[in-house]
Regions:
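A conserved short coil-to-beta-strand element within the FAD-binding core of flavoproteins
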Residues: 151-165
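Conserved mid-domain beta->alpha element of the FAD-binding
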Residues: 21-30, 66, 138, 185, ...
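Glycine-rich FAD pyrophosphate-binding loop
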Residues: 34-54
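Conserved FAD-binding catalytic core of PHBH/FMO-like flavoproteins
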Residues: 140, 182, 186-291
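Core beta-strand elements of the Rossmann-like FAD/NAD(P) dinucleotide-binding domain
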Residues: 13-15, 173-182
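C-terminal helical "tail/cap" subdomain of flavin- and related membrane-associated enzymes
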Residues: 2-11, 335-447, 452-464, 477-478, ...
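Extreme N-terminal leader/targeting segments of oxidoreductases
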Residues: 1-17, 32-36
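Active-site-adjacent segment of FAD-dependent monooxygenases/related oxidoreductases
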Residues: 54, 58-137, 141, 241
């Protein structure tokens, strides 16, 4: 066992990690930590979950992270509700659902040309669950695990040193404070944690305004077809559920992002971007934001971490932001829990920034590119037409599809020449020989060995080193070691003299006791 640095300033402390923010990223981080044995407290500024319609879906890798934590049925139920809402939309507007179905594979800058038949693994596809539904299912899972979430608790102070982090707050019951070993800021793009702890947040200034709203619109059929519609005045989208509006206004960034979004403002922007004589008769929810694009230099400062929008902000094209944040939580949670348990040295935590920051850099780059070809000027339109033609080529279509879903992501765990090409990739939800699925065996937060050796020698090697890996026999062939986040940490080489070469090194690097 590695010795854990005990934070002695307040010996009455009973919390290992404070998570700031009870949105999807904060809740998943708390779930991961709790499964790993950490004691967690979640502090949330809002009195209740936001019902604003933000993301309508999340990517395949984020969906798989939820499957690994026991939410298969909840996801299926939520997707069924989404399908029913889309059906209601078609009945309301007369839109062709078959057209919408062709767009389920995602898009690049509104170009819904990503083809499932061009993808290497077409079954790894986005999950059509909106953000309020996602947050509800994560909250239910957190409650089932006994995680305490304190709402209307606004963080007012953070003091961190080598022994721990003291977090102060204001709530309806008055001020309070607690000391924990670590703090994770999952509190959004305007993160209090990031600002109070002086994380550098370089990037580019906003140039335009996005609007998203749920509203009643007279003559909604005038806003068809379904999907992204680029005009000389901007971009608009109506659907794919009743009342959902999305507009992109290139006249500049919002003068005051904090000002309430009014019915009149939504109507004016919708009329201008669409060029249609439509009226917004009622506004139920609305938000505006800009395309400021920023990324922290590091995801960790001492005992304070950032995840999700607290660490990176960008334009929302392709629905990548929510998935990016959920995978931050999935990457950090099990590692931090292992350090708190004493199973791993603190040096493991350095891999969080090393693995996740390059992924965010890539997302920031592709969202900037999408903004560039959505602008209404002729030069941007010409580039957009060229990209659309290039997507007719299978290799280009596959590249863009994998970029947008993230399935091509690979962490550099070891030098590429020293390992199998699959090492560093996230495994899919493979069906096992007994008919069960891999992720159903990972719900306890441990790693997994898929042992394809004839005499189960790989399993024997594992059990002598760690109890944090579940061994599953599979048909004779390759063996695989998966971290708790389903990252492939090792794969056997069939033509290697020692087919278990590297297994022990991988076990000690990621699971050592």
């Amino acid at each position: 066992m590695y010795s854990v640095h005990i934070y002695t300033k307040y010996m009455t402390n009973s919390i290992d990690v404070v998570v700031a923010g009870a949105g999807p990223v904060g809740l998943l981080a708390a779930i991961e930590l709790t499964l790993g044995g950490a004691r967690v407290l979640v502090l949330e500024r809002l009195a209740s979950p936001s019902q604003a319609m933000k993301a309508l879906s999340f990517g395949p890798l984020a969906g798989e992270a939820l499957l690994r934590r026991g939410m298969r049925t909840a996801i299926d139920d939520a997707q069924q509700r989404s399908a029913q809402a889309m059906q209601a939309f078609t009945q309301q507007t007369g839109a062709d659902l078959r057209v919408r179905a062709s767009k389920f594979n995602g898009h690049f800058a509104g170009l819904s040309l990503i083809r499932r038949d061009a993808q290497v693994d077409p079954d790894r596809r986005p999950r059509h669950v909106d953000q309020p539904a996602l947050e509800a299912m994560l909250a239910a899972r957190a409650q089932a695990l006994g995680i305490e979430v304190r709402r209307e608790h606004e963080i007012t102070g953070i003091e961190a040193d080598d022994e721990g982090v003291e977090v102060s707050w204001m709530s309806p019951g008055g001020p309070g404070r607690i000391v924990a070993a670590y703090l994770i800021g999952c509190d959004g793009g305007r993160s209090t944690v990031r600002k109070m702890c002086d994380f550098a947040f370089p990037g580019t200034e906003p140039t335009l305004t996005f609007y998203q709203a749920t509203a009643d619109v007279d003559h909604p059929e005038r806003l068809l077809p379904i999907g992204w519609n680029r005009t000389e005045r901007g971009v608009f989208c109506y659907g794919p559920v009743p009342g959902r509006l999305f507009m992109l206004d290139f006249t500049g960034p919002p003068a005051n992002r904090d000002a309430p979004v009014t019915r009149e403002e939504i109507e004016e922007v919708l009329r201008r971007t669409s060029g249609q004589d439509v009226r917004v008769s009622a506004l139920h929810a609305a938000s505006r934001w800009a395309d400021n694009t920023r990324l922290v230099d590091t995801y960790r400062q001492g005992r304070v971490f950032l995840a999700g929008d607290a660490a990176h902000v960008h334009s929302p094209f392709g629905g990548q932001g929510l998935s990016l944040g959920l995978l931050d939580a999935a990457n950090l949670g099990w590692k931090l829990a292992a350090v708190i348990r004493g199973d791993m040295p603190e040096s493991l935590l350095a891999t969080y920034t090393a693995e996740r920051r390059p992924v965010a850099e890539a997302v920031l780059a592709n969202t900037r590119a999408q903004v560039a070809i959505l602008r209404p000027d002729p030069q941007s339109g010409a580039m957009r037409d060229l990209i659309a033609k290039l997507m007719d080529f299978d290799d280009v279509n596959r590249y863009i599809g994998e970029m947008m879903t993230g399935v091509s992501m690979r962490y550099e765990l070891v030098a590429s020449a020293e390992s199998h090409p699959d090492v560093g990739r996230l495994a899919g939800d493979w069906q096992l020989s007994d008919g069960t699925y891999l992720f159903d065996a990972m719900q306890d937060g441990r790693g997994v060995l898929l042992d394809g050796t004839a005499d189960r020698r790989a399993s024997q090697r594992v059990t002598t080193i760690t109890h944090q890996v579940r061994c599953l026999p599979v048909a004779e062939g390759p063996s695989w070691l998966l971290r708790p986040d389903a990252c492939i940490a090792w794969r056997s080489e069939p033509d290697c003299t020692d087919e278990l070469a590297g297994l022990e090194n991988a076990l000690r690097r990621w699971f050592a006791v």
